[in-house]
Swiss-Prot record:
Transmembrane region(s): none
Region (NifU), start-end ranges: 182-250
A biological-process GO annotation: iron-sulfur cluster assembly
Location in or out of the cell: Mitochondrion
Protein name: NFU1 iron-sulfur cluster scaffold homolog, mitochondrial
Protein family per UniProt: Belongs to the NifU family.
């Protein structure tokens, strides 16, 4: 996430620094600078070919088209970004599924969690981020994920049932000027960069100079997530908004439950290994 800290970027920020009220207005309309969409070409037939990290998967003849699914590495080695070349949730929308029990409202997420080794699923505007279990092999997971994504988009089913747009950075009537600026900065400068890495950052609150944020997708379990928050996000917020003293990563109840379950599982596994008889027969 050193992209947050480049001198050129800070110089640009200094040159464009505005008053607090002007700042809120100036952020509106700034869009992502990167386009991941990949065109689909009209074809018939079926089959697949692999080359240079790009997998071509052809839909059934009835669909009369091909889907090109590209993968992109993320800062987290346990997460991989899949770009199907079509909108997943549409511009500005994201949805996080940290485990299979949270996938009840998404037919696509349910199918992806059936792939052995998949630990988490995250949907972005035009990408799907898959987080794998530790020790699982991408060489085994990727082909199945490709097939699931291709078949799903050929089916025409909705990615989400009863989908709700992101509301964490929506400007509310009771938001003061500081909160408004924080939300605008997150939406226009910070969130697009994080989403390029296959994750998202969600505004959870602001109190006493502390901005509370939640990391999602590839960023949620990334080893550098704390560094990203402190050296990247915090620096940018403080540069524009002097009222911000620090940034804090928060975890919701679901995160704590998952962490607790993993700790319990690891403890039981360690106990079982200790109880196993040592190798070698009686002397």
């Amino acid at each position: 996430m050193s992209k947050f800290l480049s001198q050129a970027a800070l110089n640009t920020l200094r040159n464009t620094r505005l008053g607090s009220r002007q700042l809120v207005r100036s952020f509106k309309g700034i869009s992502n600078t990167r386009n991941h969409r990949i065109p689909a070409h009209q074809e018939s037939g079926c089959g697949h070919s692999v080359g240079c990290g790009l997998l071509e998967l052809r839909m059934p003849v009835a669909c009369r088209r091909s889907m090109f699914i590209q993968t992109q590495d993320t800062p987290n080695p346990e997460s991989l970004k899949f770009l199907p070349g079509v909108d997943v949730l549409g511009k500005g929308n994201t949805y996080d599924f940290p485990n299979g029990t949270t996938a009840h409202n998404s037919p696509l997420a349910k199918l992806l969690f059936r792939v052995e080794g998949v630990k988490g699923v995250f949907f972005g505007a035009d990408f799907v981020t898959i987080s794998k279990q530790e020790g699982a092999e991408w060489s085994l997971i990727k082909p199945e994920v490709f097939a699931v994504i291709m078949d799903f988009f050929a089916s025409g089913l909705p990615v989400l049932n009863d989908a709700q747009p992101n509301a964490d950075t929506e400007i509310l009537e009771d938001d003061d000027e500081t909160v408004m600026m924080i939300k605008e900065l997150l939406d226009t400068r910070i969130r697009p960069t994080v989403q390029e890495d296959g994750g998202d950052i969600v505004f959870m609150g602001y109190e006493g100079g502390v901005v509370k944020l939640k990391m999602q997708g590839s960023c949620s379990s990334c080893p550098s997530s704390i560094v990203t928050l402190k050296n990247g996000v915090q620096n940018m917020l403080q540069f524009y908004i002097p009222e911000v003293e620090s940034v804090e990563q928060v975890f919701d109840e679901a995160d704590r439950m998952i962490e607790s379950e993993f700790e319990r599982f690891e403890k039981n596994l360690k106990t079982l290994k200790q109880q196993e008889p040592s190798g070698g027969g009686p002397h």
